[in-house]
């Protein structure tokens, strides 16, 4: 997945930003909730050699997911929503995880 047309810098401290990757096969939503804090909803990874799209985006805009992502939310256990989840959780060291029973 190529990240075109996206911001190259993080949102301002007081801004809320919602970025949706997909839709189609593999969706991911990245939410800046303000004050440099982030939530990631689902993981989206295309292929085996690329990182999850949220991590690519964070790298692009200079966000450190290890300390800035506070929550990873998994909506359901379909492959297109959880592929790359292990890699995402490894990089989001302080994030809590919320997993739907669906």
What positions do the PLM features span?
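Short glycine- and acidic-rich boundary segments immediately preceding or forming the N-terminal edge
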Residues: 1-13
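Conserved beta-strand hairpin/beta-sheet module of binuclear metal-dependent hydrolase folds
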Residues: 10-65
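Active-site metal-binding motif and surrounding structural segment of the metallo-beta-lactamase
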Residues: 48-99
């Amino acid at each position: 997945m190529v990240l075109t047309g996206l911001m190259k810098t993080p949102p301002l401290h007081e801004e809320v930003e919602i970025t949706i990757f997909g839709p189609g096969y593999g969706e991911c939503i990245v939410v800046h909730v303000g004050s440099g804090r982030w939530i990631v909803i689902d993981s989206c990874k295309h292929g085996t050699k690329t990182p999850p799209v949220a991590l690519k985006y964070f790298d692009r805009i200079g966000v450190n997911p290890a300390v800035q992502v506070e929550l990873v939310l998994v909506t359901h256990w379909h492959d297109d929503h959880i592929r790359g989840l292990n890699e995402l959780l490894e990089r989001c060291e302080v994030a809590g995880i919320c997993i739907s029973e669906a």
